Amino acid sequence: MVKGTSSKPGKVRKREVYDAPLHIRSKKIVAPLSAELQQKLGIKRIRVRKGDRVLIVRGSFKGHEGKVTSVDVKKGRIHVEGATLRKADGTEVPFPIHPSKVVVTELDLSDPRRKELVERKKQVVVSGQEG
């Protein structure tokens, strides 16, 4: 007997996320901005990138702040500077953290395209409130 795919809506939605290509999955790696940044930029959430400064708000590293050292698009996790585990042989490995469990406190705007994106989103929010 051939094993078929599920028709349960929850499982179908879950499969869509995990079977999605990487360019779509990378769009799902978003985190909320801190209250100060939200007020300053007029944006509530943004894609997390290497170089952003984040505050971990959930889990065993709660309260830890550091720079994002890498983003694992395939697994949907980020690695934060200083949030590491010590293996049995003494080596340190980065602890994978889900982006929804962090708050972005400082954006890395060294990329002109990202700066442009922030400005564009800001204009959309401002024009949406006026109209």
Curated annotation (Swiss-Prot):
Gene3D superfamilies: 2.30.30.30. It comes from the Archaea. GO terms for molecular function: rRNA binding; structural constituent of ribosome. GO terms for cellular component: large ribosomal subunit. Keywords: Ribonucleoprotein, Ribosomal protein, RNA-binding, rRNA-binding. SUPFAM superfamilies: Translation proteins SH3-like domain (SSF50104). Pfam families: KOW, Ribosomal_L26. InterPro entries: KOW, Rib_uL2_dom2, Ribosomal_uL24_CS, Ribosomal_uL24_euk/arc, Ribosomal_uL24_KOW, Translation_prot_SH3-like_sf. One of its GO terms (biological process) is translation. SMART domains: KOW. NCBIfam families: rplX_A_E (TIGR01080). Part of the 50S ribosomal subunit. One of two assembly initiator proteins, it binds directly to the 5'-end of the 23S rRNA, where it nucleates assembly of the 50S subunit. Belongs to the universal ribosomal protein uL24 family. This is Large ribosomal subunit protein uL24. It comes from Thermofilum pendens (strain DSM 2475 / Hrk 5). The lineage of its organism: Archaea, Thermoproteota, Thermoprotei, Thermofilales, Thermofilaceae. The gene is rpl24.
